[in-house]
Curated annotation (Swiss-Prot):
Residues 166-229 are annotated as: B. It catalyses: Cyclizes part of a (1->4)-alpha-D-glucan chain by formation of a (1->4)-alpha-D-glucosidic bond. The lineage of its organism: Bacteria, Bacillati, Bacillota, Bacilli, Bacillales. Its cofactor is Ca(2+). It comes from Geobacillus stearothermophilus (Bacillus stearothermophilus). Ca(2+) 1 binds at D55, N57, N60, N61, G79, D81. Disulfide bonds join C71-C78. Residues 230-433 are annotated as: A2. Monomer. It comes from the Bacteria. This is Cyclomaltodextrin glucanotransferase.
């Protein structure tokens, strides 16, 4: 997590939380009409399964076996479409709730056939693509999609699309008549199907058992036809397809199944997006309760995209929904993820989604939903709310967690919690950028503080349904004063009194009570809150958000090299990456008056445009505990630093031991030198002998090189 220089507050005036209104002078992270496509930290995202939201145009509903009138069969289309979302944008339901971004189902054309199962399952969810360059006609036309984007932007709402380049649709290796045989089309022209795949557009390695990372990448996910991203046609097709949707004006992408695609290819995809028109991109890497995966952290830190924060979502569900953990476990997760993720503020948080049971339980206490939303909206990360959560919708498992939207009541307590805290999130940078500090804790009570410079938000939550707790000995960074609850007592929060030394007068926190107290003040020195994107090339534009930059142009440095300033305001700077060598750099801002911010670290400068190359080495025998890695003379291969070598390589699916392989994002059109090394669990390195391998990487396509281990 980004660290900033703590500022000592010496004011002794009495402040009230109503001073939050002074934030309007700052111009929040998003200015009206200037949607920030690379920073979502102050946003509230609302996830919509398009087919299950609103049927705004009955004329585009499918017929026959694809459709379920009245949505009695939840595995078929029910009629929701882009016009329905437009209607709810224009009637104020989303804007009044405080939604500033929507994440919608994959918009591409899906299969028109149904599965031969008990339900006759259809592609309503959008994950069974047949043509990534055409719209799903049951959601609307391309013109309808453009109207949706325009309507959202007119109301200050960003649009995120789901995108699932891992696969097409269900297919069978032995039965070409099964559904649509996974066929892939390019704007209406057939490229190929899963059987008789002479061009090798797909993988044919059987279904994954989820036994290893390699197994999940190079085998089929269930019965879905797994795309071969190293195929030059597939590589170019998918990259062109995503740029087509970017041309429609989208602001973000949720990348499906990132755990199941080659990391190297995905980094080259992110480079393609950043080269073209950067948008906030986050991937889906499912983690179960209490699961910690180092590969998950590595991907988030090295791929150029963020992730859905399953560690956050699962832990909050354990604490407030399932009672299988307590606030100590949650606080530990907050600390651990702050260390594990370089950009923890960019990870997308949630309490439920379309792949898990809804948070609200049939016959359960809606107060738990309210508490969970309050924590979600005041915690680090980009908060995402699943459609209908604000209406206390229930449903365990697919498809019961994807029912038709039940109602649009603006008076539910959950709706009002979102409304109030979305406003606070937009207007107090502590929620967008602040560190998190635990201030008071027991199994039932969690008091935590978010702080960014002088901006402070203090939150207290009591999950118990029966116990009252006296909160004594609490200290805060809030200046001395009286603070009213930002929720207006909606969850029974009260006023607190803060002394001159930061001590909070004792108060009671009742069962199910949540209190939120806030303070904000103008910064006089520069403080960086966010940089996006965090990967680029020399000349790429980068947006720096924060406070106290001043109105006169100052200096931005990548390491010790000054960048060309494109635009400068007190809260946002746009610069071009200076002419520096490839590598990772700290960014600093110096105001025109000479004051310098703390460093914002780990911006990655790539060598040039990236392509995905498969490196294969034969006859690389190893001892127990050893793995093969690749290292070379370019930054993307570690610059001969064995601690930065790429690997471990794979040896089970596409090739078998003692042949090893890995797909790596490398600079295009460049003659590179490399070698393979053996590493054991203690980090001991054995180099292959002989001369360096030499390879000239391709341009604008994928590549492959096969060599023998040199003994």
């Amino acid at each position: 997590m980004r660290r900033w220089l703590s500022l000592v507050l010496s004011m002794s005036f009495v402040f009230s939380a109503i001073f939050i209104v002074s934030d309007t002078q700052k111009v929040t992270v998003e200015a009206a009409g200037n949607l920030n496509k690379v920073n979502f930290t102050s946003d509230v995202v609302y996830q919509i399964v398009v087919d299950r939201f609103v049927d705004g145009n009955t004329s585009n509903n499918p017929s026959g076996a694809l459709f379920s009138s009245g949505c009695t069969n939840l595995r078929k289309y029910c009629g929701g479409d882009w016009q329905g979302i437009i209607n709810k944008i224009n009637d104020g339901y989303l804007t009044d709730m405080g939604v500033t971004a929507i994440w919608i189902s994959q918009p591409v054309e899906n299969v028109f056939s149904v599965m031969n199962d008990a339900s006759g399952s259809a592609s309503y969810h959008g994950y069974w693509a047949r043509d990534f360059k055409k719209p799903n006609p049951f959601f609307g036309t391309l013109s309808d999609f453009q109207r949706l984007v325009d309507a959202a932007h007119a109301k200050g709402i960003k649009v995120i699309i789901d995108f699932a380049p891992n696969h097409t649709s269900p297919a069978s290796e032995t039965n070409p008549s099964y559904m649509e045989n996974g066929r892939l089309y390019d704007n209406g022209t057939l490229l190929g199907g899963y059987t008789n795949d002479a061009n090798m557009y797909f993988h044919h390695n059987g279904g994954t058992t989820f036994s290893s990372l390699e197994d999940g990448i190079y085998r089929n996910l269930f019965d879905l036809a797994d795309l071969n991203h190293q195929n030059p046609v597939i590589d170019r097709y998918l990259k062109d397809a995503v740029k087509m949707w970017i041309d429609m004006g989208i602001d973000g992408i949720r990348m499906d199944a990132v755990k199941h695609m080659p990391f190297g290819w995905q980094k080259s995809l992110m480079d393609e997006i950043d080269n073209y028109r950067p948008v906030f991109t986050f991937g889906e890497w499912f983690l179960s309760e209490n699961e910690v995966d180092a590969n998950n952290h590595y991907f988030a830190n090295e791929s150029g995209m963020s992730l859905l924060d399953f560690r956050f979502g699962q832990k909050l569900r354990q604490v407030l929904r399932n009672n299988s953990d307590n606030w100590y476990g949650f606080n530990q997760m907050i600390q651990d993820t702050a260390s594990a993720y370089d950009e923890v503020l960019d990870q997308v948080t949630f309490i439920d989604n379309h792949d898990m049971d809804r948070f609200m339980i049939d016959g359960g206490d809606p107060r738990k939903v309210d508490m969970a939303l309050a924590v979600l909206l005041t915690s680090r990360g980009v908060p995402n709310i699943y459609y209908g959560t604000e209406q206390y919708m229930t449903g365990n498992g697919d498809p019961n967690n994807r029912k038709m939207m039940s109602s649009f009541n603006k008076n539910t307590r959950a709706y009002q919690v979102i409304q109030k805290l979305s406003s606070l999130r937009r207007n107090n940078p502590a929620l967008a950028y602040g560190d998190t500090e635990q201030r008071w804790i027991n199994g039932d009570v969690y008091v935590y503080e978010r702080q960014f410079g002088k901006d402070v938000v203090l939150v207290a939550v009591n999950r118990s349904s029966s116990s009252n707790y006296s909160i004594t000995g609490l200290f805060t960074a809030l200046p001395a004063g009286t603070y009213t609850d930002q929720l207006g007592g909606l969850l029974d929060g009260n006023t607190i009194q803060v002394g001159s030394n930061g001590s909070v007068n004792a108060f009671d926190l009742g069962p199910g009570e949540v209190g939120v107290w806030a303070y904000s003040a103008t910064e006089s020195t520069p403080i960086i809150g966010h940089v996006g994107p965090m990967m680029g090339q020399v000349g790429h534009q980068v947006t720096i958000d924060g406070e106290g930059f001043g109105t006169n142009t100052g200096t931005v440095k990548f390491g010790t090299t000054a960048a060309n300033v494109v635009s400068w305001s007190n809260n946002q700077i746009v610069v071009a990456v200076p002419n520096v060598s490839p590598g990772k750099y700290n960014i600093t801002v110096q105001s025109s008056s000479g004051q310098t911010s703390a460093a914002y670290d780990n911006f990655e400068v790539l060598t040039n445009d990236q392509v995905s190359v498969r490196f294969v080495v034969n006859n690389a025998t190893t001892n127990l505990g050893q793995n093969i890695y690749i290292v070379g003379n370019v930054y993307e291969l570690g610059n001969w630093d064995t601690s930065k070598a790429i690997g471990p390589m794979f040896n089970q699916v596409v090739y078998s031991y003692p042949t090893w392989y890995i797909d790596v994002s490398v600079p295009e059109g460049k003659t590179i030198e490399f070698k393979f090394i053996k590493k054991d669990s203690q980090g001991n390195v054995t180099w292959e002998s002989g001369s360096n391998h030499v390879y000239t990487t391709p341009t604008n396509t994928t590549g492959k090189i096969i060599v023998d281990w040199q003994n």
